Amino acid sequence: MNLAVAAALPSVTPRTGVVLPRSSRRHCPRGVVPRAASSSVSSFTSPSAAAAPIYTPTPQDRSLRTPHSGYHFDGTARPFFEGWYFKVSIPECRQSFCFMYSVENPLFRDGMSDLDKLLYRPRFTGVGAQILGADDKYICQFSEKSNNFWGSRHELMLGNTFISNKESTPPQGEVPPQDFSRRVLEGFQVTPIWHQGFIRDDGRSNYVPNVQTARWEYSTRPVYGWGDVKSKQLSTAGWLAAFPFFEPHWQICMASGLSTGWIEWDGERFEFENAPSYSEKNWGGGFPRKWYWIQCNVFPGASGEVSLTAAGGLRKIGLGDTYESPSLIGIHYEGQFFEFVPWTGTVSWDIGLWGLWKMSGENKTHLVEIEATTAESGTALRAPTIEAGLVPACKDTCYGDLRLQLWEKKYDGSKGEMILDATSNMAALEVGGGPWFNGWKGTTVVNEVVNNIVGTPVDVESLLPIPFLKPPGL
């Protein structure tokens, strides 16, 4: 794949991002003064961090709400997991925090009894909370029970109580932050516009650099969902995602947002205002066999808000033993959405064992090329697997160097006007599953019948306007 810069038209000046200097990660840029800590916790404050997070209850009708924002568990005994991912990046100190939550087989809220194992075969159950934070350090807390987990059927709202105040009952829905702090000693709650919690490492992950505790509280203003800002937001995997057809399904819930608040991490307090943020989720009977992933919404110097999400994997389709290797690139820029998916074009990838991610795509109107690298060793993260439960299954870093180039497509298929040429050194990069004996190179090859079905414009939400008729999660 040739990722050299194409010669632009003489009259066109591409919008180019500027890479942040490779300074020490904890080195605060000039003009940033750490605040005095109120206790033994040291403090970092972003240059603009003056505002405190403001809690607002989640409104019923959000303009940027995507399909599949809700919790998809249908109450049946089929194998099931759901996972959520929320990322906040602080460009001023080149640090990111990635919050990951998962629930496995929630039908068995107290774990599986001997009778359950006899009737349904042994399965892994429970709720996990992971954070990949500053300096790629890690924390994880897990419980085999999900009786204190809750999720909204139709909105991006969920929470869990690992340890409650003995004088209070665990919340079973969104509550004001003061109420949460009073009732929950260890746990979390998150909505599209509010996120808070406190977790304690349970000692299961001593194979990576970890921290003992993390506490956070921040509000978020969504900027992009998944689609044009002024249009109805889209299902990432098409309308078939409303049914248990793919294993797993995937949805970007917020391609970009601006978050304000604070995170306490390993004895250091990070305060921020309007920090770039992101959220996505997946659900189904099991994780892909193998996958790769790129996400970045920190592009200094680029005009307007820019967000990139690109990924692919080997996943199961239907009830048989059939697998496909779909791949996707989605770009939000200046309010517009540029989508490269199998049902509208082609996507190619060239992924190394670790350290190199190359992707390109084309649709009827545009061409895109992505190259990302990292010299970091990466951190092993956990994923809910059918075979072993929540175990190390992927490797991530938030210190990827990335270049994103987007062109208009000429009538002959060649590159036309360059729309965007942006760079970053804060890309989140991941490879997972396996085995990864070698690199992985290919072009989207999907089942043609499935491709035609997925590409059919069907608005499932409009077909089922009454909430209780909608499938869970939609």
Curated annotation (Swiss-Prot):
The gene is SXD1. Residues 1-65 form a transit peptide. GO terms for biological process: chlorophyll metabolic process; fatty acid metabolic process; phloem sucrose loading; regulation of defense response; response to high light intensity; response to oxidative stress; response to temperature stimulus; vitamin E biosynthetic process. Involved in the synthesis of tocopherols (vitamin E), which presumably protect photosynthetic complexes from oxidative stress. Catalyzes the conversion of 2,3-dimethyl-5-phytyl-1,4-hydroquinone (DMPQ) to gamma-tocopherol. One of its GO terms (cellular component) is plastoglobule. Keywords: Chloroplast, Isomerase, Plastid, Transit peptide. This is Tocopherol cyclase, chloroplastic. It is found in: Plastid, Chloroplast. The keyword Isomerase applies. It holds the Pfam family Tocopherol_cycl. GO terms for molecular function: isomerase activity; tocopherol cyclase activity. Its main location: plastid. The keyword Metal-binding does not apply. Present in all green tissues, both in bundle sheath and in mesophyll cells.
